[in-house]
Amino acid sequence: MYIHGMGGGSDSRIPSILAEALPYKVVCRTYSFDPEVAEKQMALWVEELKPDLIIGESLGCLHALRLSGVPKILISPALNAPQYFEALAWLTLVPGVTSIFNRIYKPREGDRQPLHFTFRTLRKYRRHRKLAMKASHRNGGQDAVHAFIGTRDHYLRSAIVSTRTYKKHFGATCTLYDGSHFTEEEYIRSLVIPKIKELLKG
């Protein structure tokens, strides 16, 4: 089961590569930007699919962490994004700001996650992150977790993606590679796919 990032969807690039390259069934479904609505969607999908592995990408990593009992791979984990959403939430109270954010972050064409930046939705991400991090190894989480973080990820500068944050909560269970936030295909094939096979065989 693949959980896409913000503005992604069922036709996102990485799960499409995985579906073509792997002998396993890869399922990626478009979910709500509202984390409370998405939580219910994820619970139903896990019950239906009974996945052997969950892969989270970027903001989707927080959803992945909340689904216990299944090994996980996190790609470009944006674990600190909710802290920025907290600040953005207050800005959306200014008339016109929500419309500006909606235009700036408008998803690509296709089956993509609709984005609507409202105070109510953005404020929910604080609780969402808190619940996700309860599953960390530091807090007693038992699920196998491995992350892939690109050293050229532009979100490292703002710490939205943070190697330090990841290691604080999950230890050294991560692979650093010379790639960007979007994880180029060569790294999907050379790093992520072997790890998927390793976890599923284990």
Model segments located where?
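Gly/Ala-rich beta-loop-alpha elbow adjacent to hydrolase catalytic centers
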Residues: 55-65
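Active-site catalytic motif of lipid deacylating hydrolases and related acyltransferases
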Residues: 1-49
